[in-house]
Structure formats: C-alpha cells, structure tokens
From Swiss-Prot:
The gene is fimB. One of its GO terms (molecular function) is DNA binding. Keywords: DNA integration, DNA recombination, Fimbrium biogenesis, Transcription, Transcription regulation. InterPro entries: DNA_brk_join_enz, Integrase-like_cat_sf, Integrase_catalytic, Tyrosine_recombinase_XerCD. This is Type 1 fimbriae regulatory protein FimB. The keyword DNA damage does not apply. GO terms for biological process: chromosome segregation; DNA damage response; DNA integration; DNA recombination; resolution of DNA recombination intermediates. It comes from Escherichia coli (strain K12).
Length: 200
C-alpha cells in the first residue's frame, strides 16, 4: 500500500485521478474554461506557459487539429483534436464571448479578460485537485508528466512520444517508458519461445 510519502514523490496522475480532476474542474462559475484548460493540458502535454500562450489561430475546429508551440527549444507540431476536446472547446469559446476583451487572441482568459497567467493556472489546477479529494499536491506540470506516462502505458513507441511531447533529447522521454512495468509483461514467455532449453 502506498503511503503519503510515496504520493508526495509521485509527479503524475493515474487515469482515475485524471478523471476525478476533470470532474472537479468542470464545476463552478468558470467550469467550461477550467475543464477545457485541464483536458487540453493533459491530452497534449502542455507546459503551463504553452497553454497560457495558446492562440485562437492555433485551433482549427473544422479540421480537428491544434498547433502546439513548444517552449524550451522543443519541437513545435500539430496534434489532432479528440471529439471530446472539440466539444469542450466549442463550449468554452461560446462562453468566452461574454468575457471582457473577448476579441483577444488568447484562448484562455481570466475573469477580467486578461490572458490567463501561469500563477492563475496553477491556482485552478491546485484548487481542482483539492476539490477532487486527491492526496497529491497537484501542479500544472503533473499533467504533462501524466500525458507521457499514459502514452507509455498504452505501449506507444518512445520516438513517437518524444515527437508528441516535443522533446529534443530522447532521454527525457525514456523516463516515461522506463517506468512502464507493462513493457515487461510476457518477457519470460518470449524468452522461452526463443530458447529451446529455457531455465523456467
């Protein structure tokens, strides 16, 4: 059984924790914004600065794609949008028109109509984590790590994860796949299949 010390060391969320976080984010006066913000950040592995700088022009709802401007000299690229992301974006963008400075180029606005800051994003995620009853201290970068671990757990190729997250150095990506216990499943069965005189 994992204790609180283990949870403090863990810097990613499990599938069920992500679901709880999204459910908590989808409440309150800014539910549409906070849910969309959290969902996109997890699905695409956004850094806080990247999601806060997301522009309206980066999103094409008809083509169902989003352009990711990676920071820290990462590789920028275009990602497909899932249907639930398209719906979340449509919901938020329709409500966004009632915010001050709705003509702004930035996708996510504060209640005063300013571009959402990293500090505000941190507060949103931290508050959602608390409302979800999660035992971890939640911060935005955990969503990026959660994306990497989720892809690795699904057996996605390391090189593809590297491109998806915009890593220039694959060593940053290997960290996700190296922690995936699933890659070892059946390893002894495969070994027995290759050797006539197996030990086990």
């Amino acid at each position: 059984m994992k204790n609180k010390a283990d949870n403090k060391k863990r810097n990613f969320l499990t599938h069920s924790e992500i679901e709880s976080l999204l459910k908590a984010a989808n409440t309150g006066p800014h539910a549409a914004r906070n849910y969309c913000l959290t969902l996109l950040c997890f699905i695409h592995g956004f850094r806080a600065s990247e999601i806060c700088r997301l522009r309206i022009s980066d999103i094409d709802l008809k083509a169902k794609c989003i352009y990711i401007h990676r920071l820290k000299k990462g590789f920028s690229t275009t990602h497909p949008l899932l249907n639930k992301e398209v719906q979340a974006l449509k919901n938020w963008l329709s409500i966004r028109t009632s915010y001050p400075h709705a003509e702004s180029e930035w996708v996510f606005l504060s209640r005063k109509g300013n571009p959402l800051s990293r500090q505000q994003f941190y507060h949103i995620i931290s508050t959602s984590g608390g409302n979800a009853g999660l035992s971890l201290e939640i911060h935005p970068h955990m969503l990026r790590h959660s994306c990497g671990f989720a892809l690795a757990n699904m057996g996605i190729d390391t090189r593809l994860i590297q491109d998806y997250l915009g890593h220039r150095n694959i060593r940053h990506t290997v960290w996700y796949t190296a922690s995936n216990a699933g890659r070892f499943y059946g390893i002894w069965d495969r070994a027995r299949g290759r050797q006539r005189h197996a030990v086990l």
